[in-house]
């Protein structure tokens, strides 16, 4: 029993040791696999929460990976220590068990020599109850046999039998004891051999465990060393970066200085080259002048010699055959009449023409030289700007993006910025505005979506979150600004101008209609027909005065037009009484009359044919690959023979022109006197309408209207038409919201080109309203010369820079060299040369300022006023031949690009002056400085043209000013003194009062019953009878 238990314990110990060996045989691959699984689980848990931060900030991810590795290593070390402790405890237990087993074997070996009581004590110590009981049972039998005193008394008859049995039993027991002793000795020998084998195995296992522990210890130490090495490497990298930063700053400074020196040297060399070129050009000009003078003298001499030879030959022929020559040839007669002074005049004319041509060529050369010099100066300025930008960037501190911080105080602490510093955000370019703010010590926030800013300048109003803006943050857009910036919003807001000022909309804004509104569409059709009638009358009168035979063809058309216009513009008070006349008045133009007026216009069939032929042309051009190009005209040189003919022809024509002028002057006098009754009526009507209608001069002979999409800019989708059918068809075909506006047919032209004026306006507040006018504008020209024959050519009718820059121009003049633009000074000089005084400053500019005020006042109720908001607007204005300005549109976020040299200078100045107004003047005004000190602060070229009063409760369409009452004085006589009333008079008065009260009560009851009936009729659907009855009642 004891041996079996011992063997079972040994087997259990071996299994536990094998399991421990397997658990401690750890490789590097197992550790790496566990580490990867652990990191994957850790990342999967937190990936959705912190993914956007890890993408933007990879440094955070690296730091967290380091922390994860350190935690994993710490846990691994703890596990190793715990396994060590478990292993040590198990080893101790095994040693104790082995000692106990050895002690047991020793006890069994000495059991033959020991007494029975000692054997029992040993067994009791080892807690072997089952063995103890078996031994006690054997001993009880022995005691009964060997010790009779403990035995019970028995019968005498059985004594003999017991004695024999006793002897037999003793012999058998002794034999058994000997056998047991021999077996026990064999078992003890076997146990000793097994114990020695087990001890040898334990020693081997202990040595293996010690090797595993040493490996683990070495591995942990190696990991610690790696961590230390990484930390040391990171510290070394930090030190290197700090040293590299200091070195890079010094290198940048040295690099900038070297660049500056190189650029200065290049500029010096370039200036030397320019000086040499200028000297060479002067010498060449002198030589050319000398050659020109010599050529002129040679031409004069040659021409005079040839003329003298011709005259001498002609005189000889005249003297020989005087009569025959006069009868046959008329050329000789004309040559005879030519005298020497006339020849000299013709020569001077030819020489002047040559001079003009030479001067034009010189001007072209000088303009090209000036352009070359300007381009060189431009390059110098750009290089200087680059150097300044590099130096500024080296000084400016680069900030980190912090997307999850909303408070300004925390953001400044994280960026390590002082609390007093001002922060701005700029979106969409605007480099000059950035420079202006950086000069003033502001700091740029690179994160455009951040709520941490003091000023934000954006291209679009969508980029501003109006719901979450703080009241002290400055923004460059107003909410709901479409009431002034969109074409439909401007139209609707200008209709309410009479609530704010005594100004007529028709004096500065051409007629405009919304094609999507049915009422306005009908008004447009009516106004188109009326303006067509006016154009017919103008055309008829012009043809009649020019004595063109075509005026008889359009006389019927003019008679109908005059009839229509006189009926329409007749006083409505004379027409309203007669129902027939009233219906004709409101109908304005019947269909029969319109057919006569629109006889020269396009019908629906003609429009379909036109579209068909246009598609066929497009298909042919696409198939053949033909491209239409503008033909370049080349100048041809004139020979001496051509000059001679021109001289003789000009001398002959002068006499003929003088005779014709005398005849024409006599005829014109007769025309003024002799005029038909119809034409005189037309003339009188047109003169009356010119006085009454402020837009009379805009209506020309062609009746052109311009169609615009309401939401597009830069000339996109704009077309011009003069046929009603085409306008309606175009408006229906477009899915966008369209607007129709009267085309200005009498614009001022400069060198046969149409132009408009771009003006910048700044609004800093709506309550109280503050308007700033930038006192320098620029002019934008069309790319081609103006004509109304081809309305599809956008280069003739549109002045947007986005369109004109696409035109490939062949020749160059002052306008094209400047990018189809003029400065304000050039415009003023043009008016001084043509009109003799500065028309822009004296007449046009005051009207433009009034237009700006009226347009902004008209929408002051609809635009949401917010403190610390401002906006820059771009006004487009055109001028007619009477020097009246007309408002075309108002733009938000006007283009501030360097499209030309003119815009480059002005854009820089505008953005710098905006910073002066908003930052310098605005911040000083908020601080509560006196007005005298505020006036000293410079605002550049921005002038305040309007400062309104603050309104606490602004109502919709509130009356602002100019409520006028008119009338005449009245004489009121004093009432006569009445006599005292008697008793009868009092009774009569009481009766009258009672009757009046009864009538009032009766009327009130009737009124309440009528209201109840009306409510029932509105609530129920009316039948045909009830509708007729209600109409009769009304």
Curated annotation (Swiss-Prot):
The gene is TTLL3D. Probable glycylase which modifies tubulin, generating side chains of glycine on the gamma-carboxyl groups of specific glutamate residues within the C-terminal tail of tubulin. Residues 1-13, 131-146 have a biased composition (Polar residues). It comes from Tetrahymena thermophila (strain SB210). Keywords: ATP-binding, Cytoplasm, Ligase, Nucleotide-binding. Residues 189-199 have a biased composition (Low complexity). Its EC number is 6.3.2.-. This is Tubulin glycylase 3D. Pfam families: TTL (PF03133). It is found in: Cytoplasm.
């Amino acid at each position: 029993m004891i041996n079996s238990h011992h063997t079972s314990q040994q087997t259990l110990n071996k299994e536990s040791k094998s399991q421990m060996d397997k658990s401690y045989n750890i490789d590097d691959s197992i550790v790496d696999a566990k580490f990867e699984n652990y990191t994957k689980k850790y990342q999967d848990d937190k990936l959705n929460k912190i993914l956007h931060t890890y993408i933007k900030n990879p440094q955070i991810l690296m730091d967290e990976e380091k922390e994860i590795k350190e935690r994993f290593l710490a846990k691994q070390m703890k596990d190793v220590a715990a396994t060590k402790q478990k292993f040590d405890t198990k080893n101790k237990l095994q040693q104790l068990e082995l000692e106990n087993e050895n002690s047991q074997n020793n006890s069994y070996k000495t059991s033959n020599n020991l007494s029975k009581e000692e054997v029992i004590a040993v067994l009791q110590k080892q807690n072997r109850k089952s063995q103890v009981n078996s031994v006690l049972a054997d001993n009880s039998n022995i005691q009964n046999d060997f010790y009779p005193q403990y035995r019970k008394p028995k019968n005498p008859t059985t004594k003999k039998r017991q004695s024999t049995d006793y002897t037999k039993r003793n012999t058998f027991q002794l034999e058994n004891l000997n056998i047991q002793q021999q077996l026990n000795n064999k078992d003890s020998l076997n146990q000793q051999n097994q114990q020695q084998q087990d001890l040898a195995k334990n020693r081997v296992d202990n040595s293996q465990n010690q090797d595993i522990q040493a490996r683990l210890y070495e591995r942990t130490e190696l990991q610690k060393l790696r961590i230390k090495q990484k930390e040391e490497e990171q510290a070394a990298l930090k030190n290197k970066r700090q040293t590299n930063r200091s070195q890079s700053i010094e290198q940048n400074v040295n690099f900038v200085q070297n660049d500056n020196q190189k650029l200065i040297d290049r500029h010096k060399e370039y200036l030397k080259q320019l000086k040499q070129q200028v000297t060479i050009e002067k010498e060449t000009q002198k030589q050319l002048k000398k050659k020109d003078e010599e050529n002129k003298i040679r031409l004069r001499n040659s021409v005079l010699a040839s003329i003298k030879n011709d005259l001498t030959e002609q005189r000889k022929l005249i003297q020989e055959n005087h009569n025959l020559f006069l009868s046959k040839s008329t050329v000789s007669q004309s040559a005879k009449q030519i005298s020497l002074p006339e020849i000299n005049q013709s020569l001077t004319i030819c020489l002047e023409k040559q001079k003009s041509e030479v001067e034009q060529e010189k001007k072209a050369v000088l303009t090209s030289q000036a352009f070359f010099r300007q381009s060189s100066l431009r390059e110098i300025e750009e290089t200087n700007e680059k150097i300044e930008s590099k130096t500024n960037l080296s000084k400016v501190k680069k900030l980190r993006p912090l997307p999850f911080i909303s408070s300004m105080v925390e953001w400044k602490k994280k960026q390590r910025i002082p609390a007093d510093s001002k922060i701005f955000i700029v979106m969409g370019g605007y480099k000059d505005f950035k420079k202006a703010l950086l000069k003033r010590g502001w700091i740029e926030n690179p994160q455009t979506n951040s709520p941490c800013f003091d000023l934000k300048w954006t291209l679009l109003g969508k980029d501003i979150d109006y719901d979450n803006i703080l009241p002290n943050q400055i923004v460059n857009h107003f909410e709901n600004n479409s009431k002034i910036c969109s074409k439909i919003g401007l139209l609707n807001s200008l209709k309410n101008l009479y609530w704010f000022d005594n100004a007529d909309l028709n004096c500065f804004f051409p007629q405009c209609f919304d094609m999507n509104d049915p009422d306005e569409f009908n008004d447009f059709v009516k106004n188109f027909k009326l303006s067509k009638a006016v154009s017919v009358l103008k055309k008829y009168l012009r043809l009649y005065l020019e004595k063109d035979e075509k005026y008889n063809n359009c006389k019927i058309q003019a008679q109908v037009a005059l009839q229509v216009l006189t009926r329409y513009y007749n006083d409505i008070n004379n027409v309203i009484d007669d129902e027939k006349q009233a219906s004709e008045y409101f109908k304005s133009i019947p269909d029969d009359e319109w057919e006569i007026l629109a006889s020269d216009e396009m019908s629906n069939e003609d429009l379909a044919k036109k579209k068909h032929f246009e598609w066929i042309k497009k298909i042919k051009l696409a198939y053949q690959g033909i491209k239409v190009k503008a033909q370049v005209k080349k100048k041809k040189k004139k020979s001496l023979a051509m000059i001679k003919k021109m001289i003789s022809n000009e001398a002959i024509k002068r006499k003929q022109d003088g005779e014709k002028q005398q005849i024409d002057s006599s005829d014109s006098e007769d025309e003024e006197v002799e005029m038909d009754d119809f034409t005189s009526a037309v003339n009188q009507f047109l003169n009356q309408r010119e006085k009454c209608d402020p837009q009379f001069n805009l209506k020309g002979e062609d009746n052109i209207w311009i169609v615009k999409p309401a939401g597009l800019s830069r000339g996109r989708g704009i077309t011009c038409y003069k046929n009603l059918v085409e306008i309606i068809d175009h408006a229906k075909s477009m899915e966008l919201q369209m607007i129709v506006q009267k085309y200005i047919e009498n614009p001022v032209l400069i060198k046969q080109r149409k132009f408009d004026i771009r003006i910048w306006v700044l609004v800093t507040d709506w309550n109280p309203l503050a308007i700033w006018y930038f006192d320098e504008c620029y002019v934008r020209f069309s790319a081609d010369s103006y004509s109304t024959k081809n309305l599809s050519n956008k280069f003739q009718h549109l002045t947007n820079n986005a369109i004109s820059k696409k035109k490939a121009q062949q020749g160059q003049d002052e306008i094209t060299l400047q990018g189809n633009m003029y400065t304000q000074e050039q415009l003023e000089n043009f008016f001084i040369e043509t009109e003799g005084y500065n028309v822009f400053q004296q007449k046009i500019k005051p009207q433009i300022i009034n237009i700006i005020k009226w347009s902004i006042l008209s929408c002051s109720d609809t635009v949401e006023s917010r403190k610390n908001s401002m906006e820059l607007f771009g006004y487009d204005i055109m001028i007619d031949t009477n020097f009246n300005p007309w408002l075309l549109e108002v733009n938000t976020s006007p283009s501030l690009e360097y499209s030309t040299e003119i815009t480059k200078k002005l854009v820089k100045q505008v953005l710098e002056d905006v910073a002066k107004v908003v930052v310098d003047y605005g911040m000083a005004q908020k601080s509560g400085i006196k007005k005298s000190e505020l006036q000293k602060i410079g605002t550049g070229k921005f002038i305040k043209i309007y400062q309104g009063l603050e309104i606490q409760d602004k109502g919709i369409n509130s009356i602002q000013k100019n409520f006028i009452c008119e009338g005449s004085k009245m004489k009121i006589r004093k009432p006569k003194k009445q006599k005292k009333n008697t008793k009868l008079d009092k009774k009569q008065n009481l009766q009258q009062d009672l009757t009046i009260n009864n009538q009032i009560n009766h009327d009130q009851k009737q009124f309440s019953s009528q209201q109840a009936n009306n409510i029932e009729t509105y609530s129920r659907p009316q039948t045909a009878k009830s509708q007729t009855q209600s109409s009769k009642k009304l």
